Amino acid sequence: MKQFTYTVKDELGVHARPAGLLVKLAKKYSSKVTLEKNGKTCDMRKLMAVMGLGIKQGETITVTVEGEDETVAAEEIAAFLNENV
């Protein structure tokens, strides 16, 4: 299992565009990818679940990746967040 935290920098937070791209990225991997904010957890492969967390600028999220390709998945998701959110 790989886990990391990220503090959202984008002033709009995780809105529709980055949420959609995150879901698309998570679906590339066979590993289970979850996103957590303030104790609420969701499957990162489900757009409405990700949007439902209402992630805003300055909030910290935790990403957990578990499965065969967890290392590469965690690295790519972390890179995406750093570049886009």
Feature-to-residue mapping (PLM):
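Intrinsic-disorder/low-complexity, polar/charged segments enriched in Ser/Thr/Lys/Arg/Asp/Glu/Gln
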Residues: 1-5, 60-62
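C-terminal structural segments of small proteins and small subunits
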Residues: 51-85
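Compact, glycine-rich, soluble single-domain proteins
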Residues: 7-44, 48, 52-57
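Compositionally biased, low-structure terminal segments
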Residues: 5-7, 81
